[in-house]
Amino acid sequence: MFKIINTLLLFAFVLCIHKNATAQQDWKDINTVEEVCTNYTETIENMLDQFNLDYPGLEKVKRDFENGNLVNACYELLEYYKNGNTASDLRKTLPKKTDQTKSETDTILNNVFVVQNVRGKVPYLTNGHRDWYYKGPNNDKEWAWLSNRHSQLNNVFNTYLETGNPKYAQYIDLFLKDFIILGMPYPAVKSSTSVWRGLEVSFRAKVWPKIFYGLLGSDYISPATQLLLLSSLPDHAHYNRNFHSSNNWLTMEISALATVAAYFPEYKNSEEWLDYAIETMTQSMKDQVYADGVQTELSSHYHNVSLHNFELFQEICDRANRKLPDFYNRTIEAMYGYIAHMVRPSGFRVMNNDGDRGSDQNLILKGAKKFGHEDWEYIVTNGQTGRRPEDGPSYFYPWAGHFVSRSDFDRDAHWSFFDMGPWGSGHQHNDKLHLSVSAYGQDFLVDSGRFAYTGEVAEKFRPYAQSSAGHNLLLIDGKGQQNGPRLANKPLGEDHFKIATNFDYASSSFDQFMDLEGSVKHTRVVFYVRGQFWVVVDNIETDRPRRIDALWHWHPENTVVKDRYTVKTLNERGNLTL
């Protein structure tokens, strides 16, 4: 009896020693299949459970896994991917080894990330992992979110392909291992944390497949990291499948779900993920794009974001040989048409709602080529190439309520944007009846744009940017507009606009103001005499005397002076007088 007890105690003691020895292995030193299977047995077993082991080519993986040989099953799985033809468009010819470097990427290798022009160095925790919850030098949660989308990792990946310097691939290996291990276990709940928020999940799910397939034959990416990545991708897909949002967030999250499904058809749930993605994305397009082709958030920036993700989804379905409804392609064409018709003569987009003043020229040229629209090419090249449109030069989108007036299509053309639409389904500003004006390549009257979402700038200026005070509107007794209707339930009728040979006319009203006693209604009429000038008439209907402040925001590059009853610019070329 004494001998038996001693044996049991010795056995227990040996088990404890083995377990502790395993736990003590530094995660950074886990590189081989054997090491990852020993240290993260449950994770790797769960990873293999995510695969359809009856998928053609996985016969050896199934045999070894069912026989309890986890290590061999993982070797066979990696061999399957190395020798397969899945995701042929992502597989890369590995570069020859060099010592070439790129200084910008070397900054990333020091864990210095630039997010929205803010530079921050991600610190290390006591366990040797990077602090993926670090919010940058300004303690900005947006900084942490964006850094966890792994665009910096994509940058390092591209630099490795360009230079062949092993240090870039080695950084990717350790980066992914660090991130995935520290993020375990997957929480499987909707979250707004720095790591597990829907947008960040979706961006990583698009970056990681590029890296996995692009570096499959590399000696600098360890088998352990490859297996950890394969274990985490189903978690990313699960999140985007079950916890996605709506509007443009949905397009990003669902296109990420489809990305994982299309590039990894071996996962058990890939077929269901793709079915769900097609159904959801198709319905989302119907819900968030008006009949005139404008995305319902009514921000040119997020219109482009949605378009990008709709197109990305279309490309994914094409690669997976999955057909989309005809209206899907027609809607994408209409979305391009809106961008082409709204663009300023300079090639920059409208800065409405949460928008940025970015160039749409290349995007429009891409759409023109894709759909054979030489008229769009003509517009965005100021008539240098393409074919002159049979309509225009002014355009009205009745569901969005967006009216653009032009004198012509040349670079010096007059251009104005008049907003008669609803508030928008997201990223809204209280800016109905706002008017922007440009001419001679110069912006004169401008929109506040987005400014920033979080951080010091946002705390100071975000409320102003969203309010009527940040737009070319009227304040009534110092009060701006309340939130208007989110969506249009019908297009604006012909009584609201007219486009004639020599003039444009547009008119709309708004009657909901913040904390204002009594009734008031603001009607704005914009009359543009083509090639000459604009007439803006503001009419106020009210039940009592009011103080009216008319706001006109000039682009800061203008030199503006007041001359008795007029305000005017003193630019060298191209001026505006009010």
Question: What role is predicted for each listed range?
Answer:
Residues 64, 68-84, 434-435, 439-454, ...:
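Acidic-aromatic substrate-binding/catalytic surfaces of carbohydrate-active enzymes
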